[in-house]
Amino acid sequence: MTFTKSVDQTTILQGDRSKLKDLLRVRLNACGWNDQVRLLCRETIKDQDTVNCDALVQQVTPKARALIPDTVKKELLQKIKAILIQQEGIDI
């Protein structure tokens, strides 16, 4: 079993996954990331004649991920580590 699968299974079973998703949603909204991605989508659509949803997602996703502040990434990682340590006693 890979580490990622272990994290997924552990967080799903313990109900922490939704808490982590809520935290991420709040932090991204607070730093203006949602607005940045919305503008990025508008610019992408405006620059092309026809864009379907799948193509838009493919084009915007890498740029949107790069816009996530390091502080948000670090906070989420710390929360995940704390959950794993608390639940599994995993030494990371």
Swiss-Prot record:
Any single GO CC term annotated in Swiss-Prot or TrEMBL for this entry: nucleoplasm
Keywords (A to Z) from UniProt: Activator, Chromatin regulator, mRNA transport, Nucleus, Protein transport, Transcription, Transcription regulation, Translocation, Transport
Pfam families the record matches: EnY2
Subcellular localization(s) per the UniProt record: Nucleus, Nucleoplasm
One Gene Ontology term of the molecular function aspect: transcription coactivator activity
Source domain of life: Eukaryota
UniProt record, GO biological process: chromatin organization; mRNA export from nucleus; protein transport; transcription elongation by RNA polymerase II
PANTHER family to which the protein is assigned, alphabetical: ENHANCER OF YELLOW 2 TRANSCRIPTION FACTOR (PTHR12514)
Oligomeric and partner information: Component of the nuclear pore complex (NPC)-associated TREX-2 complex (transcription and export complex 2). Component of the SAGA transcription coactivator-HAT complex. Within the SAGA complex, participates in a subcomplex of SAGA called the DUB module (deubiquitination module).
Function of the molecule: Involved in mRNA export coupled transcription activation by association with both the TREX-2 and the SAGA complexes. The transcription regulatory histone acetylation (HAT) complex SAGA is a multiprotein complex that activates transcription by remodeling chromatin and mediating histone acetylation and deubiquitination. Within the SAGA complex, participates in a subcomplex that specifically deubiquitinates histones. The SAGA complex is recruited to specific gene promoters by activators, where it is required for transcription.
Family statement drawn from the similarity comment of this UniProt entry: Belongs to the ENY2 family.
Protein name from the UniProt record: Enhancer of yellow 2 transcription factor
Source species of the chain: Culex quinquefasciatus (Southern house mosquito)
Gene that produces this protein: e(y)2
